A protein has these predicted regions:
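Acidic, PIN/NYN-like endoribonuclease modules and their adjacent C-terminal/linker elements
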Residues: 1-9, 112-113, 118-140
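Active-site neighborhoods of divalent-metal-dependent phosphate/nucleic-acid chemistry enzymes
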Residues: 80-123
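Conserved N-terminal glycine/acidic-rich loop preference
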Residues: 74, 79-88, 103, 131-140
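Short, well-structured N-terminal submotif of metal-dependent ribonuclease cores
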Residues: 1-46, 60-70
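Short active-site oxyanion
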Residues: 40-45, 77-79, 119-122
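Histidine- and aromatic-rich ligand-binding microenvironments
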Residues: 10-13, 47-48, 104-106, 128, ...
């Protein structure tokens, strides 16, 4: 059964990229399955430069330079959405609203702002529960 059939684009979280580019990650197998569907369905991959930064840093420190470097060489495959100052302020407000009670990062808050705004609520691929708790359509 196809999880992604019918979608033209998806937003990729750092947790998806980390799982996809590290064979040691607990979600690696699932990330590969999703990536095969993405290729088969010709789905566009959207993300943000904040996500790319987070993913390459986690890959480097958790799994090593090779994984981080291979991911870095792939960034031309993704449509990186550029953020505006007003979106940073919206993300900070969301972070301040939820950050005290849960472990929501600023990057997750900014992703929410981008997905619900300029990206018109496209689904997100994430193994991070924060996306689901923020009310985003999340595939994992």
């Amino acid at each position: 059964m196809s999880t992604l059939r019918g979608f033209r684009s998806v937003f990729c979280d750092a947790s998806f990229f980390v799982a996809l580019f590290s064979k040691k990650d607990a979600e690696h197998k699932r990330a590969l399955e999703l990536f095969k569907e993405i290729k088969a369905e010709k789905i566009s991959l959207c993300t943000s430069w904040f996500i790319i930064s987070e993913a390459i840093t986690v890959l480097l420190y958790k799994y090593g330079y090779t994984e981080a470097s291979v991911f870095g060489e792939s960034i031309h495959l993704y449509q990186a959405v550029h953020s505006k100052e007003t979106q940073y302020h919206q993300a900070l407000a969301l972070f301040n609203l939820y950050g005290k009670d849960r472990t929501i990062s600023f990057v997750d808050a900014l992703s929410h702002v981008l997905i619900t705004g300029v990206l018109k609520n496209i689904p997100a691929i994430s193994f991070d529960e924060d996306f689901r708790s923020l009310g985003l359509t999340t595939i994992s």
